[in-house]
Amino acid sequence: MSKSLVAYFSASGSTRKVAQRLAKVAGADLFEIVPEQPYTAADLDWADRNSRSTRERDPKCRPAVASTCENMADYDTVYVGFPIWWYVAPTIINTFLEAYDLTGKRVVPFATSGGSRMGVTVAALKTSAPGATFAAGDVLNGASDAKLEAFVKANA
């Protein structure tokens, strides 16, 4: 039997809400990707060229994660949720993916965003989990349970 995990990073709580609902619909375990150094409001100020989120746009940046998923080997499908920052996933998602051997696993990205779509997000994440199979993913802002169920079914 296939076992699924919903892992997510949420700076403001929006992605957390979607992740919790998705885990329930998918019958999946839930894991929060917590940054070692929490983000402050100043860190998330998109207009500030020196804010942490702006500096972390560097594709080589790998913000530290505070905890690890001890039983990653148990999962066949890993849903990975995040807010879209600067048209891609925050680099903490790369940190998370690179911490595990995801060879043979299906990675299903999902995001929340104020206006962006997935764009090049999946392509940018694939290099962090070269042995995994990636789904196209989707932005799930305010998704109904029916949309979440369809998303799970399409990515089973």
Question: Language-model features: where?
Answer:
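Short, glycine-/small-residue-rich phosphate/pyrophosphate-handling segment
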Residues: 108-144
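N-terminal beta1-alpha1-beta2 submodule of the flavodoxin-like/Rossmannoid cofactor-binding fold
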Residues: 1-77, 87-89, 94, 98, ...
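Glycine-rich, N-terminal phosphate-binding loop of Rossmann-like dinucleotide-binding domains
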Residues: 82-83
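A structural micro-motif
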Residues: 26-28, 105, 132
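P-loop/Walker A phosphate-binding loop and immediately adjacent motor/lid segment at beta-alpha junctions
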Residues: 50, 105-106
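Short, conserved loop/helix-junction motifs that constitute active-site signature segments
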Residues: 72, 98-104, 127-129
